[in-house]
Amino acid sequence: MRVPVFQLSCLLGLIVCLLCSVKAQKDDQYDTEKSRILEIYNNPAVDEFTKERNIPKLIEFYRRYPARIQLPDADKRQWDEFVARYTESQTKLVDGLPAQGGWVGSVLSSTVGNLIAKFIFSLIRYDPTTPKPIGAP
């Protein structure tokens, strides 16, 4: 049985539309999550506690969109080490709860804070859709 060319072209068009729709949905999700991350980490009015509390969301964003985040190799290695260390620290339990304080406390005033700043800068710098701060080139 021969399938008419018209039916095949309609089927092909439908498949292309579905694939484009899925990609657009992923882009919208990326943009939404990126905006949330930038609202927290690119806003000087947000306190350190809020930034530290949102580190798991930052890590999840990095894991979900690794190809979209352009870090130099050295920063990427440091970031991967930070993620591994942070994840390990959250899995260690003390009296049935994750350990409090330790190396994660005041994380944003340390070299890890600088690494997070580089991560946020890469989101702003390499993505043309990200609004730049007032006065930025």
Swiss-Prot record:
Q: Which Pfam families match?
A: Turandot
Gene encoding the protein: TotX
The biological process GO terms on file are:
cellular response to heat; innate immune response; response to bacterium; response to heat; response to oxidative stress
* A Gene Ontology term for the protein's cellular component: extracellular space
**Protein name per its UniProtKB record:** Protein Turandot X
Species for this entry: Drosophila pseudoobscura pseudoobscura (Fruit fly)
Location(s), subcellular: Secreted
Keywords in UniProt for this one?
Immunity, Innate immunity, Secreted, Signal
Known function: A humoral factor that may play a role in stress tolerance.
- Chain segments annotated as transmembrane: none
Keyword Amino-acid biosynthesis applies: no
Q: What is the lineage of its organism?
A: Eukaryota, Metazoa, Ecdysozoa, Arthropoda, Hexapoda
Family statement: Belongs to the Turandot family.
Signal peptide residues on this chain, from the entry's feature table:
1-24
